[in-house]
Amino acid sequence: MENRWQVLIVWQVDRMKIRTWNSLVKHHMYVSRRASGWYYRHHYESRHPKISSEVHIPLGEARLVIITYWGLQTGERDWHLGHGVSIEWRLRRYSTRVDPGLADQLIHMHYFDCFADSAIRKAILGHRVSSRCDYQAGHNKVGSLQYLALTALIKPKKIKPPLPSVKKLVEDRWNKPQKTRDRRGNHTMNGH
């Protein structure tokens, strides 16, 4: 029998980021209770040998599943050590892959407090606004001028530890070009 390949969209990730992500998810599920309804599935509960963990996040009828893998083929670089993350949106029998920015937006819409459109109107009219955004990772673009003024007025509180962000999990901190300077402070030829 010949080998059959199955191709998935998987984001290559540093294994320490996966450990940090899993511990943040568990903290907010069991300690702070901000991620109530989320389900963490260990590697020994999965029948697939490459899956290291799964986090199921209910979004109304649908759910978001963040699957972390180990033992994958290594990448082009030395630090791509075979760890990865896939992000899947499921509704009944339909499933599709989503990017980290969209995953953060979906989590933000369903779970964490944010400014409503009415909050901007209330602030302009001089009424008291008590809401604040708890999940800054869910905003992937610059808001309106009124929104920016409102965020300057009401500072978001810092949550320790931070809420788990899918975009932060898959960000590529290794491939960013390093700024190098010679001893006089000038850019060298091999730097960017």
Curated annotation (Swiss-Prot):
<dbReference type="GO" id="GO:0030430">
    <property type="term" value="C:host cell cytoplasm"/>
</dbReference>
<feature type="binding site">
    <location>
        <position position="108"/>
    </location>
    <ligand>
        <name>Zn(2+)</name>
    </ligand>
</feature>
<feature type="region of interest" description="Interaction with host APOBEC3F and APOBEC3G; FG-box">
    <location>
        <begin position="54"/>
        <end position="72"/>
    </location>
</feature>
<dbReference type="GO" id="GO:0020002">
    <property type="term" value="C:host cell plasma membrane"/>
</dbReference>
<feature type="region of interest" description="Interaction with host APOBEC3G; G-box">
    <location>
        <begin position="40"/>
        <end position="44"/>
    </location>
</feature>
<feature type="short sequence motif" description="BC-box-like motif">
    <location>
        <begin position="144"/>
        <end position="153"/>
    </location>
</feature>
<keyword id="KW-0694">RNA-binding</keyword>
<protein>
    <recommendedName>
        <fullName>Virion infectivity factor</fullName>
    </recommendedName>
</protein>
<keyword id="KW-0597">Phosphoprotein</keyword>
<feature type="binding site">
    <location>
        <position position="114"/>
    </location>
    <ligand>
        <name>Zn(2+)</name>
    </ligand>
</feature>
<dbReference type="GO" id="GO:0044423">
    <property type="term" value="C:virion component"/>
</dbReference>
<feature type="region of interest" description="Multimerization">
    <location>
        <begin position="151"/>
        <end position="164"/>
    </location>
</feature>
<feature type="modified residue" description="Phosphothreonine; by host MAP4K1">
    <location>
        <position position="96"/>
    </location>
</feature>
<feature type="region of interest" description="Disordered">
    <location>
        <begin position="170"/>
        <end position="192"/>
    </location>
</feature>
<feature type="site" description="Cleavage in virion (by viral protease)">
    <location>
        <begin position="150"/>
        <end position="151"/>
    </location>
</feature>
<comment type="similarity">
    <text>Belongs to the primate lentivirus group Vif protein family.</text>
</comment>
<feature type="short sequence motif" description="HCCH motif">
    <location>
        <begin position="108"/>
        <end position="139"/>
    </location>
</feature>
<keyword id="KW-0014">AIDS</keyword>
<dbReference type="GO" id="GO:0046872">
    <property type="term" value="F:metal ion binding"/>
</dbReference>
<keyword id="KW-0945">Host-virus interaction</keyword>
<feature type="region of interest" description="Interaction with host APOBEC3F; F2-box">
    <location>
        <begin position="74"/>
        <end position="79"/>
    </location>
</feature>
<feature type="region of interest" description="Membrane association">
    <location>
        <begin position="171"/>
        <end position="172"/>
    </location>
</feature>
<keyword id="KW-0862">Zinc</keyword>
<feature type="region of interest" description="RNA-binding">
    <location>
        <begin position="75"/>
        <end position="114"/>
    </location>
</feature>
<feature type="modified residue" description="Phosphoserine; by host MAP4K1">
    <location>
        <position position="165"/>
    </location>
</feature>
<dbReference type="Pfam" id="PF00559">
    <property type="entry name" value="Vif"/>
</dbReference>
<dbReference type="GO" id="GO:0019058">
    <property type="term" value="P:viral life cycle"/>
</dbReference>
<dbReference type="GO" id="GO:0016020">
    <property type="term" value="C:membrane"/>
</dbReference>
<keyword id="KW-0472">Membrane</keyword>
<keyword id="KW-1032">Host cell membrane</keyword>
<keyword id="KW-0946">Virion</keyword>
<keyword id="KW-0833">Ubl conjugation pathway</keyword>
<feature type="region of interest" description="Interaction with host APOBEC3F; F1-box">
    <location>
        <begin position="14"/>
        <end position="17"/>
    </location>
</feature>
<dbReference type="InterPro" id="IPR000475">
    <property type="entry name" value="Vif"/>
</dbReference>
<keyword id="KW-1043">Host membrane</keyword>
<comment type="subunit">
    <text>Homomultimer; in vitro and presumably in vivo. Interacts with viral RNA and Pr55Gag precursor; these interactions mediate Vif incorporation into the virion. Interacts with the viral reverse transcriptase. Forms cullin-5-RING E3 ubiquitin-protein ligase complex (ECS complex) by interacting with host CUL5, RBX2, elongin BC complex (ELOB and ELOC) and CBFB/CBF-beta. Within the ECS complex, Vif interacts directly with host CUL5, ELOC and APOBEC (APOBEC3F and APOBEC3G) substrates.</text>
</comment>
<feature type="binding site">
    <location>
        <position position="133"/>
    </location>
    <ligand>
        <name>Zn(2+)</name>
    </ligand>
</feature>
<comment type="function">
    <text>Counteracts the innate antiviral activity of host APOBEC3F and APOBEC3G by promoting their ubiquitination and degradation. Acts as a substrate recognition component of an E3 ubiquitin-protein ligase complex: mechanistically, Vif hijacks a host cullin-5-RING E3 ubiquitin-protein ligase complex (ECS complex) and the transcription coactivator CBFB/CBF-beta to form an active E3 ubiquitin-protein ligase complex that targets APOBEC3G and APOBEC3F for polyubiquitination, leading to their degradation by the proteasome.</text>
</comment>
<keyword id="KW-0479">Metal-binding</keyword>
<feature type="modified residue" description="Phosphoserine; by host">
    <location>
        <position position="144"/>
    </location>
</feature>
<keyword id="KW-1035">Host cytoplasm</keyword>
<dbReference type="GO" id="GO:0003723">
    <property type="term" value="F:RNA binding"/>
</dbReference>
